[in-house]
Amino acid sequence: NDWCALGDWEVNEEKIKGGLPALAEKIHGLGLKFGLWVEPEMISEDSDLYREHPDWALKIPGRAMNRSRYQLNLDITRKEVREHIMNQIFKVLDACKADYVKWDMNRSVDNVFSAALPKERQGEVYHRYVLAVYEMMESLVQRYPDLLFESCSGGGGRFEAGMLYYSPQIWCSDNTDAIDRLKIQYGTSFGYPISTMGAHVSVCPNHQSGRTTPFETRGIVASAGTFGYELDLMKMSE
C-alpha cells in the first residue's frame, strides 16, 4: 500500500508463488508482454531500508519533514544509495526478464538537505539530484537495451529532453480525465512529439475530476499519445 515498503525492492514470494519469474512466464505464455512498476527515488518511513538507513532520506535538520503520499525522497546524490537501489532493481529484472518498466515519481523533491554534504554545499543538492537520476537511468538502459522504458512527469514535472534521452516515452500527467487531457497533451505537443506522451483510457467516472466521459472520447484522446488502458479490463464488455 501507499504507507510502506518503498525502498525495499524485493519480491514477496508469500504473495507471488514462485516469484516474479513464474508470473512473467505465465504472462509471456499468454502472448503478452510483462511489465513492472518501480519508484526508485522514494522511500517509506515504514520500510526496512529507512529503519536501517534513516539518513538516506533527504531531510532538513531541525525541521518537520514534509511528507507527500506518505513518502520521502531518497538522497540519491549519494553513490551508495544509488548503487543499493539499482542493484535491488537489477536483481529483480534479471530474474523476471521484464519487457517494460515504468519509473514512477509521485512527489516533487523537497526537504532538500543531504547528510553527506556540509552546510555550505547544500545549494548543490538539486543539481546533484538530477545528475543522479540520469546516472541511474543510464545504468538501466545500458544493462537492458531492449527494455521499453517509461519515465514520469506526474510528481516532478520532468517532461524534458534529458529524460527522453533515456526513456522514449514519459507519463504526461496523473490527470487522466480526457477533457483535461486535451489541454495537457495539446500544450505538450508544442515541445514534444505525440509518440513521447504517455496517455491512457481511464475509468469512468474519472478518479481525479469525477467527470463522466464517453468511452469513444477517452479512446480518441488517448490515441493522441502512446495509448493504453488504465482500468480493470475484466469489468469491460467485449
Locate each region found by the language model.
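Hydrophobic faces of well-ordered beta-strands that scaffold small-molecule active sites
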Residues: 34-38, 101-103, 150-151, 229
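Conserved, mostly hydrophobic/aromatic
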Residues: 27, 85, 104, 149, ...
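Aromatic-lined carbohydrate-binding/catalytic grooves of carbohydrate-active enzymes
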Residues: 1-84, 100
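Active-site beta-loop-alpha junctions enriched in small/polar residues
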Residues: 39-43, 106-108, 152-156
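Active-site-proximal substrate-binding groove within the catalytic cores of carbohydrate-active enzymes
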Residues: 133-238
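Alpha-helix-loop-beta-strand connector modules within alpha/beta enzyme cores
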Residues: 17-32, 125-144
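Alpha-amylase-like alpha-glycosidases and glucanotransferases acting on alpha-linked glucans and related
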Residues: 66-97, 165, 198-203, 219, ...
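Active-site groove signature of glycoside hydrolases
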Residues: 1, 84-118
